[in-house]
């Protein structure tokens, strides 16, 4: 996709809410090209609503929320439960072909391989997939759709670790603009260059990455340390479990991973995946 306008999103004097609950009160924001913005806060604080307002999917009560130049801003929106909207009668490979008809077929097949779909899945109807497989296919479909502005609402839900890492690498290599909602702090650490914290009708703008946000927010920093400690305990358990595997089991696991994700450097794959958007 071509470059977007310099101003990708603008919010002026925005006040918005539902019934008696006010989500935003006189909010002003500007998001520029190439920023990767994390939108964080408790459930129900208005993050998804803000995404819809900026895209024009919902009208504000007062004030303005809009994209920059709509002719130049090519938007791709990954919303929650997107996997549920996949056409169950269409095959796995055909789902990507319909999303990106100009993309070489071998490139689409390679992407499916990196998303752990071997050739036996290519003609399988989407309705036969598990919930996790549908989530991975929805992400693959998202990745092949050309865009220069990406809106992602909880994109890592139901993704396995390799798929999540591939998404992180692709987003870091992406030259366009990213707005991401996620409760996955480790994901946000990898991708964010700016943080918008939603809290009780206010949005605090941290013009730095997620580590910068933590350094300015004691409560969030303490919570992040607890989550990091829990993650280490889980990783230790996985290491112990893996050490108990037989040599044959380890060899089989290694072979399956190699088959699913192919060969080549991670950076090269990330650039190729990001290139589908750029």
Predicted features and spans:
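ABC ATP-binding cassette signature C-motif
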Residues: 3-278
